[in-house]
């Protein structure tokens, strides 16, 4: 027998030792078999640690569960020693993030045993008064086995599983895209629930003051994409649906396992804001070009790099006026996440996708800009449905919020209250839809501009929790109305819509059915039991079900036009256009071209609407200004 073995990542000495072993009289086959057995046992132990080994009457389901858990921990990692914490690794983590805070708290670390449990660290923090230190320790997660995604379209993301350092010592590390990490931590938190509080800390400390998250997250900090004009894969922007459902699932787990811990987190200023150098444009600019909505602040990016050199990974967090890390409570972090979505709410339509990135749930990946998500609206409703009673049950009657955030909350509450009678009752007119969209959008713009231009003032304002709850309850109620407005005539629900904005209002353009819309509505906790059953039956009898696979499709298997059937400009349209008629008469092919049979097409050089807009601008300067102005 023979085998092919790849013993990779070996240095020159190790290579020669391996060669000597092969040339020796040792039973190589037996050594390899023994190593495979040890590796298999180690892998089984890892899967077991995350509750992946089950024994049930359904062997196929048990095996399926084991493979799911394996793939899960390969992305998000696992707590290889459960709740055990190595003090040396904890101190290394804290020093890497903020050397000054670490040095100021050497007494705290000296008092800790060399090996401790999560609960020991939690108890030690109760006697601590340094909230910066508490933030660092609350964010510590001793994870291992996490790998990068390995998607070739993301050059940074080379496949790797690192479990040992160069000296062969166990390596605690994790890294990945935001979705890869938090989607898998949701499941992991069921196995080690107390660390769920630290996962929440990691999540909210990596979100920005304007309510979004960077692209990449690692043990060493956060990272974001930068403009690369020469790289067709590169782009900046925020994915639209990360902020809600992943955080909500972690909060739900925390409430289920340790509600007292979550309440204590609500009022402690032990959380920070990521300082991503993206600047979302004004509402008017977004409305003018919803595909180009974010600017990259190169000077701020350089300042952040310098801060990282000086203080550690904390340099990527929003500073306070004194240059330290600005900290707020968990209640504020949750509110920022929710308000950023509510501010992009369009009645009867969904949540506007206007940050240059699609949603992961978007099966088309092409709706960003004019696309509006019912999917995210459903998850927003579920979040609001949970957070209203959560805030109502808090023991305090007031909460301290950043002055800027408190004013933003007040403006959003005012908009919802003034339009409650219309958007809270059912479908509204295009005019009212635009009025609400503009009022919310400009409120968010004022808040963002204040943060962008001045940073956080660090001035806190006392806000009645009753006012916070009132705002969130109003948002919950209108979200429920809009979700129901998206019920299709066939009993399914819209997943995504498009909008057309004009001077008179906002029109909704509905799309075909998609699976994600049904999943989101079922997850929203809006439907009654009989409504959910009806939807499931309708789904089974819809074009989304495929009997061949006994499963469901993301969207129906539609008959699409062939290549030769595309880009055909109808004769009636050409004849109604003075501009096209004039261009064809003069032989100008900047906008349209014609074949020998008389069929008209848009110029083949166009790859998007921006190309068409540029051509129209050129034509306006070449003697066609009147016609361009009339038809543009």
Give residue spans per PLM region.
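Acidic, mature catalytic/reactive cores of soluble proteins
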Residues: 1-632
């Amino acid at each position: 027998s023979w085998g092919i073995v790849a013993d990779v990542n070996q240095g020159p000495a190790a290579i020669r030792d391996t060669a000597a072993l092969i040339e020796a009289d040792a039973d190589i086959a037996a050594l390899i078999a023994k190593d495979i057995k040890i590796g298999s046992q180690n892998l089984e132990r890892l899967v077991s640690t995350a509750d992946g080994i089950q024994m049930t009457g359904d062997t196929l389901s048990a095996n399926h569960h084991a493979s799911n858990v394996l793939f899960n921990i390969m992305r998000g990692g696992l707590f290889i020693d459960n709740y055990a914490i190595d003090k040396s690794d904890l101190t290394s983590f804290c020093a890497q993030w903020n050397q000054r805070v670490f040095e100021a708290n050497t007494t705290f670390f000296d008092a800790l045993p060399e090996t401790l449990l999560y609960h020991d660290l939690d108890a030690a923090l109760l006697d601590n008064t340094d909230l910066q230190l508490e933030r660092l320790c609350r964010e510590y997660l001793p994870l291992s086995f996490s790998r990068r995604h390995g998607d070739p379209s993301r050059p940074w993301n080379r496949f790797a599983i690192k479990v040992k350092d160069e000296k062969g010592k166990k390596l605690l590390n994790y890294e990945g895209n935001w979705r890869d990490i938090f989607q898998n931590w949701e499941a992991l938190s069921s196995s080690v629930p107390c660390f769920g509080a630290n996962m929440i800390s990691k999540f909210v400390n990596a979100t920005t003051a304007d309510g979004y998250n960077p692209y990449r997250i690692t043990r060493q900090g956060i990272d974001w994409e930068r403009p690369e004009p020469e790289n067709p894969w590169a782009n900046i922007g925020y994915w639209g649906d990360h902020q809600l459902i992943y955080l909500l699932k972690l909060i739900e787990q925390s409430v289920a396992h340790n509600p007292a811990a979550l309440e204590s987190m609500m009022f402690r200023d032990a959380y920070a804001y990521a300082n991503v150098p993206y600047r979302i444009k004004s509402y008017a600019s977004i409305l003018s070009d919803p595909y180009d909505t974010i600017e990259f602040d190169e000077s701020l990016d350089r300042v952040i790099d310098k801060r990282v050199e000086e203080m550690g990974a904390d340099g990527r967090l929003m500073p306070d006026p004194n240059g330290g890390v600005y900290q707020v409570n968990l209640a504020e972090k949750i509110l920022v996440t929710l308000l950023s979505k509510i501010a992009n709410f369009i009645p009867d339509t969904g949540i506007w996708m206007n940050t240059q990135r699609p949603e992961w749930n978007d099966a088309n990946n092409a709706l960003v800009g004019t696309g509006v998500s019912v999917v995210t609206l459903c998850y927003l409703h579920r979040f609001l449905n949970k957070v209203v009673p959560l805030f109502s049950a808090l023991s305090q009657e007031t909460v301290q919020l950043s002055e800027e955030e408190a004013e933003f909350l007040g403006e959003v509450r005012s908009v919802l209250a003034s339009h409650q009678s219309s958007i809270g009752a059912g479908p509204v007119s295009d005019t009212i839809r635009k009025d609400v969209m503009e009022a919310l959008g400009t409120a968010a713009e004022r808040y963002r501009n204040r943060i962008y231009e001045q940073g956080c003032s660090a001035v806190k304002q006392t806000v009645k929790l009753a006012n916070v709850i009132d705002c969130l309850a109003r948002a919950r109620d209108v979200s429920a109305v809009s979700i129901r407005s998206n019920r299709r005539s066939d009993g399914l629900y819209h997943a995504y819509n498009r909008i057309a904005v004009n001077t008179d209002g906002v029109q909704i353009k509905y799309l075909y059915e998609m699976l994600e819309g049904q999943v989101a509505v079922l997850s929203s906790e809006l439907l009654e039991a009989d409504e959910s059953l009806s939807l499931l039956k309708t789904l089974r009898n819809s074009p989304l079900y495929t009997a061949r696979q006994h499963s469901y499709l993301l969207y129906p298997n539609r008959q699409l036009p062939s290549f030769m059937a595309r880009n055909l400009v109808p004769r009636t349209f050409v004849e109604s256009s003075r501009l096209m008629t004039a261009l064809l008469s003069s032989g100008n092919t900047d906008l349209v071209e014609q074949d020998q049979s008389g069929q008209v097409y848009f110029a083949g050089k166009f790859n998007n609407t921006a190309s068409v807009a540029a051509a129209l601008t050129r034509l306006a300067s070449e003697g066609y200004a009147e016609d361009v102005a009339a038809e543009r």
